[in-house]
Amino acid sequence: MIKPLRTTRKARAALAAAAVTGCLVALSPSAGATATAAAAPPGRVAVDVASVNGSGCRPGSATVAVAPDNSAFTVTYSEYLASAGGGAAATEGRKNCLLSLLVHVPQGFTYAVSHVDYRGYGKLEPGAIGTQKASYYFQGMSQTANRTHQFHGALDDNWQVTDTTGIEALVFAPCGEQRNFNINTELRAEVGTSDKNKTSYMTVDSTDGSISSVYHFSWKQCPVRR
């Protein structure tokens, strides 16, 4: 689902702080968790950046924060922009970022990411094309969801896309194991049929922290070992 947004800087900050609706992955549920979703666990949930690679996110340009109620975590980028036309180099038309995260959860719980909200800004000349892609997977597991959203010029506005998967299709981290959660995103800008002398761009970056990607947790309790 694609929603252009018209917001002020203050409104964007409020929007980024709010819980919203959004993503992930598929195939069969992981073994070792009970069948029904649980409330967010008490105690501290922490998300650490294990590594960051890609043309859209040099080290230090992506930050992560966990919601106080353990319902979600946010990723904020500061330099993630793809551009085309107007003399931009061909390499500027595609940017990517691979984040590998360590998610520390209270004992007895496991998690999946049930939905994700991506936000950014697009300036596309008439005929230009922008693309946002994302996939997610746990370290050592093959389950990967690929989601693609396209935007067509003319566009000069904030944008939002939401990726979501039903609870019956979620993939949970194996109980009792620490596996990195990997997020692979891509941003493209293409001239298309637009005037190649004019610049078009797509961004998910935020210089003031007002635009973040929001990853919503789904929790399950692990069976008690006897």
Regions found by a protein language model. Give the residues of each.
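Cysteine-clustered segments with highest specificity for TGF-beta superfamily mature ligands
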Residues: T74-T76, N158-T203
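N-terminal leader/pro-regions and domain N-caps
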Residues: R6, K10-A13, T34-G86
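An exposed acidic His-Trp-rich patch
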Residues: S114-E168
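Extracellular and analogous surface-interaction loops
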Residues: L102-T110, V171-C175, S218-P223
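Proprotein-processing/basic-patch segments
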Residues: A189-R226
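Short, solvent-exposed beta-strand/turn "edge" segments of beta-rich domains on protein surfaces
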Residues: G85-R94, L102-A112, K123-E125
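Generic short beta-strand segments
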Residues: T76-A84, V116-Y121, N184-E190
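Secretory targeting and sorting signals
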Residues: M1-T34
